[in-house]
Amino acid sequence: MIAQDIEKVLLSEEEIENRCVELAHQIEEDYKESGETPIVVGLLKGSVPFMAELIKRFEFPCEIDFMSVSSYDGTESIGDVRILKDMDLSCKNRSILVVEDIIDTGRTLVEVKKMFKNKGCLDVRCVTLLDKPSRRVCEIEADYVGF
């Protein structure tokens, strides 16, 4: 049943689950090939359900951490990216897989990737459930895109 304030469902639960399986397999192949043990970093709080769906399907070693960043005031992007909670693990000389729920303007991802590079990370990749390239104001793309 659809709530009264929702006009229509764009993606079914089954479509999302199937795409998560495909993404997890693709990510797994890439990391198995490289032999790396990445730190999977979820950007709080929106990425949590998507990240849970992904990592329960991973069949390769990884560590999990979270960051809280914001470039929004309510529903509007303000352009300024702030780190509200940094990750706990050391990421120097490590590979990072950033998990995003949606890439909109791209500002958050640009700043997060820059921060990881400045901390000495070897490799920074990103997986997002939803991508909105029509809203992009920065030159950036996710390495893995759900929809």
List each model region and its residues.
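PRPP-associated nucleotide enzymes
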Residues: 1-147
